[in-house]
């Protein structure tokens, strides 16, 4: 609820969407989590952690190509461990 309140009050605050997505992953609501990661990325195109986590979530739900695309973007933005994960799924 707190994240929803923050998102309502500050709709451009990327970290609120990112944190809500992380919480949804813990609750195993992966499709909703992807939606919130996507909103975080739309608010901040350079949000490497959001690309990374969305990529992992895509891979978890077996959307490997989308996951690899996001992990690649996360790597470009400085999360170099993403490249190691990509090599496992190609």
What are these regions (language model features)?
Residues 1-90:
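Alpha-helical tetratricopeptide repeat
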């Amino acid at each position: 609820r707190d994240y929803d309140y923050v998102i309502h009050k500050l709709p451009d605050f990327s970290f609120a969407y990112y944190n809500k997505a992380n919480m949804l992953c813990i609750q195993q609501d992966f499709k909703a989590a992807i939606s919130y990661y996507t909103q975080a990325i739309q608010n901040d195109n350079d949000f490497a952690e959001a690309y990374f986590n969305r990529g992992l979530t895509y891979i978890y739900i077996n959307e490997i190509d989308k996951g690899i695309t996001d992990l690649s973007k996360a790597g470009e933005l400085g999360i170099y461990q993403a490249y190691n994960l990509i090599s496992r799924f190609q």
